[in-house]
Each structure stands twice: as C-alpha cells, then as structure tokens.
C-alpha cells in the first residue's frame, strides 16, 4: 500500500531531481524529510507518529465509505499488502480479527511498523511477512480480504487474485480499493512519468480495466460493484466530498457562464449526478477504481 495520492489532487510532488533510494523505506524517509511536502506525506499517511496517522485514516471519509461496503457482522479480515498497517488498524478498531500480509519487513513502512502499531494501540493483529501471490493462510478461512492500493503492485496479478479468492470463505468479500487504471496500455509511460512517488523508488504500475476484471473473474470472484474515480471518496481521497465540490466549483467559475453552473453544485443531487457523469468520461492515465467482489457461496 504505497501510493497514497494522485499527482493532480492538489498535493505537492517531489522534485524531479530526487535521488533514487535503495529501498522503499529510504524513499519514504527522504520524502518525509523534504521541506514543503507535508501535504503529500499526510495524504500518504506517512507522517509520524504512525498511531496518529492510523487514527486519522480510521476517522476519514475514505474509511467511512469503505466501512459502509463491508459486512456488519465482522469476522476474520485479511489486509493484503498491508504496508504500514493503517487499514489493519481501522479493521481492528471496527472489531474485525485481522491478519496483515506484507512482504516488506520494514519497521517504518512494513511488517515491523504494523507490529509496533498493534502493540502501542493494544490491538490483536497477526502479521505475516510474505507476498500476496502466496498467502500462508488456510483455504476458505477468511470472511474479508481488503487490499488498498495493492493489485497494481502485483508481480503476478492473476495469481494474487487467485490467492485472495482461495483464502475467502464461500460468500466472503474481496475489496480491491484505489487501483490505477489505464484506458490503453500505451498510456503507462505517461502515468509513470507523472506519478509523484514513482520517481523516488519505482515499483508503480497500472493496468487497463479489462485486465483487472479478467484477473478477478478468472479467480472465481464475482464483481458486484465497480466504483469509478469520482463516484466515491474511496477513490478521490485525500479530497473529501466538500473539498472536491469546492475544487469543481472553482474550475467552473473560470469558464464562460460558469458561475451559474458552479452554484448548481450546491445541490446534492446535482453534485452527485455531476460526479457520476464525470467519472464516465474521465480518461486520465492512472485514475483510481475500486472493485467490490464476492466469492460465490
């Protein structure tokens, strides 16, 4: 769970002259140390102490929207590609029993950070170090697999989706949140050039929508909901509904006759309809989608 923010969401980017750190941990350390990058660091939940960042994520509009999609009964949740553990924290706070799977052992951005966070906050989070393509969890044992910004990092997208499906109980849910999508494969170089964190370490990727759908369906999962870029705060965070509205209104006011159109967005139904329409014409390379899937019962 590395790339916490899009380059066009009003957050500062690292300078093009940034060095090439040897690890993701050192890349994040470099970013945190840069003057003027506070907004980006907070948007990625890399600010310290980690417990404060995790609490902010749990209280965010993004997590509230995720929570609304999840089963209400709780159960066993697997946080796939858990990063520094903010989603594991949120799940545990919401009374899920949590297994966090993270390949990076880092005490800053990986498994070590999750263990320290769980200990400091008194939460029971089981941490497994390993890749999502081979999860050390029994088949049909998990009620929920949650993966925030993970699928586009997979070494093998199809295998990762197969593993997520394997560990789910029949009727279980898989949520793949904030996945970078391309309209065409040839857009990938442009996306990587503009991504604010790819410059620091690499490791970013994106797929065309068909590739995600095929990988999920071939794994035996049913896609029950597909959230486009501006349809849900899950995708347009760190903006909130209110701040996105202000941004859209500001852009409209610059257009001829735009003042009246901007005022119309004060009406919730019109604002929601405008976001729905914009989500269907959005062609930005790397725009964010969320996939809500179930394993058939």
How would you label these PLM feature ranges?
Residues 4-72, 74-83, 90, 173-198:
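Conserved class I S-adenosyl-L-methionine
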Residues 195-211:
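Acceptor-substrate binding/catalytic loop of class I
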